[in-house]
Amino acid sequence: MRALITGCQGFIGKNLAEHLKKQGHHVTGIDKKLKVGDPVYVHEFIGHDMESTITIENDFDRVYHLSADVPNSKGVGGSQLTTGRSNPIQTIQAMDFAAKNKSHFIYAVSAMIYNTEYQGHNGPDLNEDEHIWPAQPAGNIYGMEKLYNMQLAIEYAKAYNMKIALPIFHAMYGPHCDILVNSKVVAAMCVKIIQAEDPGEIEIWGDGTQIRSFCYIDDLMIGLDKLIENDIQLPINMGSDEAITMTQLADMLIKISGKKIEKKYLPAGPAGCMRRNSDNTKIQKLTGRKPNYPLVQGLENTYQFIKDQLTEK
């Protein structure tokens, strides 16, 4: 099997490349450029801006489209305008290439597509059939364009008789995560704890009661395989079944660190929605997929990876 990964140098792209290579597949990757000293995880790397037409002559059995500009609450990454303009163009370029080559197209959907009215303190576990529509995704443009691109992929599949997979990613974490520039919740908290004095203190945005379910990266890889093996072409959650608060997450990581650290809450900080938890009923029913990695095991692996990375730097 020959696979093409867009955004191959990102967190998920690196893990996916390693996963596919271990299975014996040939992996080609596309990204804008290599960072100095950044290893390549694919067999063949192509420097390319995904806003431009893909002109690769090779045929691919699968196209995994991970490339995206992601604005975040710290102002790092693309602006709202950059995200709203760039990501649909990138996705159309990837889908045009997949349609032309009759490739199985796997599009990385975000849990930010879910209607925000269901993400309050007493909100339900989010499922694909009841909580996406009517459309009211997260307040920034990223959730909106992800929802638009998901629907566009469905239309491409109809028009070009193209196989698709639409995994909805819920708070992924694990080795190869970004730790200093565009870090997500788990990685950012690991960095804070590792860099804190002992005894010391870390800051937590919000009041600590925000709830998330974090999915370990290896569980995502298994889930992607299951979607393709079972030819599931519906939007489908990729999450874990362990929902925890930010305070609980901090306590688990502090325990892993072995340090004595106090928590300082910043209620005025960007806390995000109050509750976003994945309902995994559909994927379990259709594919039998269940998360294999308990949260504590995934956090231990991730904490050690980040600690090693910071030590090397």
Language-model-detected regions and their locations in the chain:
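Conserved beta-loop-beta element that borders a ligand/cofactor-binding pocket
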Residues: V109-S110, M150-P175, D198, E203
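Active-site helix of classical SDR
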Residues: I141, E145-Y148
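C-terminal substrate-binding subdomain of Rossmann-fold SDR/epimerase-dehydratase oxidoreductases
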Residues: Q195-K313
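SDR active-site strand-loop-helix element
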Residues: T6, I30, V63-D69, F105-A111, ...
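Flexible, glycine-rich beta-alpha linker
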Residues: I113-T116, I141, A165-V186, I211
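N-terminal Rossmann NAD(P)H-binding glycine-rich loop of SDR-like oxidoreductase domains
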Residues: A3-Q23
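NAD(P)H-binding glycine-rich loop region in Rossmannoid oxidoreductase-like domains
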Residues: G47-P88
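Conserved Rossmann-fold NAD(P)-dependent oxidoreductase catalytic core, especially the SDR/UDP-sugar
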Residues: I92-I141
